[in-house]
Amino acid sequence: MVAFEGAARLGFRYVETDVHATADGVLLAFHDPHLDRLTDQHGRIDRLEWSSLRHVRVAGTEPIARLEELLGEFPDLRVNIEPKSDVAVELLINTIRRTGAEMRVCVGSFSDRRLHRFRAV
């Protein structure tokens, strides 16, 4: 969240994030599918539940942001989001609707299948 806070504080109105789904269906605003490179833990996000990820720290200090938290904390930010799995697409649609963020989220993907799936809903 600290990166998004910094962007907002500097006056940026648009941010970008990838989202990965945890094993129990929580969307995380995180670039990598694995924890190994950026955190103090190891493993794949999609194989772990949020209860075990909530204590993981990015660069040893910052928690991984939940997408719902990001959308709620920064209602004035426009967010470009890439769902990184098919599972994340359905969860993303539900999260956007639940947070009322339809008019400030742009969804993009290098996967045509994911984009078609998103557009179909």
Can you say where each PLM-predicted feature lies in the sequence?
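Phosphate-group recognition and catalysis centered on beta-loop-alpha active-site segments
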Residues: 1-121
